[in-house]
A protein has these predicted regions:
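Low-complexity, acidic/polar, glycine-enriched regions of mature
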Residues: 19-220
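Sec-dependent bacterial lipoprotein signal peptides
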Residues: 1-17
Length: 220
């Protein structure tokens, strides 16, 4: 044991000596940040529809892009623990808006086309549904979620990440999703179905950002 202590002391002195020979001007202070996990409080939380929205973005392979929003019309989450989260969000596709096209006529034409059966066929499928099956805190206020996305009557599993921030016993969520529209029969100029359209092909991946505010259900 005495020999082990001596060896450790010698090694420590060598390390200190080695560090002291470095240029003091080049030394940098290393700070270790303690990231606090977000602990979710059990309960049922309802979406505040007027303060929540879903942002969308899609791209043409030629470089053009469009972005806009759709409105959350209802939704809630039920929290049992930080790893046991389930819920459902319903989106009104008739509320679809486009932000990037400033010309009123062009904007109206695009939205009309997106609502047609070439794309989301909102006459027959007015809503899209996102279900949360489970959620896991992975770092700080960042969570990984497993869920299901339903568009045009077709449901597929989806994995996505997002941040959840507590705000006076309520929560703000910022969720990032990417879905392949071709899986949901949204096939117009699909990159996976057509190869002869050149830069007129529209990318299959559609990006969604769900910005939602939740308030605890006072009746529970």
């Amino acid at each position: 044991m005495r020999l082990s202590i001596i060896n450790i002391t010698i090694i420590g002195l060598l390390l200190i000596t080695g560090c002291s020979t470095k240029d003091k001007n080049s030394s940098k202070e290393v700070k270790v940040l303690n990231v606090k996990e977000t602990k979710l409080n059990a309960g049922i939380y309802n979406v505040l529809e007027g303060s929540s929205q879903v942002l969308w973005e899609c791209e043409w392979l030629g470089g053009a892009r469009h972005d806009g929003s759709v409105q959350l019309v209802s939704g809630s989450i039920e929290i049992s623990s930080s790893s046991d989260v389930n819920g459902k969000f319903i989106v009104d596709l008739n509320s679809m808006k486009c932000f990037d096209l400033k010309n009123e006529g062009t904007n109206k034409k695009l939205i009309g086309h997106l609502k047609s059966d070439d794309f989301f066929d909102v006459t027959n499928y007015p809503n899209a549904v996102l279900e949360l099956v489970s959620g896991k805190n992975i770092s700080g206020n960042e969570f990984k979620f497993n869920g299901n996305l339903t568009i045009k009557g077709r449901t597929h599993p989806i994995i996505f990440k997002g941040t959840v921030t507590e705000n006076n016993l309520s929560y703000d969520a910022d969720l990032k999703l990417i879905f392949d529209r071709s899986k949901y029969d949204v096939r117009y100029r699909s990159a996976s179905l057509f190869s002869d359209l050149g830069d007129r092909i529209i990318a299959d991946d559609v990006k969604l950002t769900v910005k939602a505010k939740f308030k605890r259900d006072s009746k529970i």
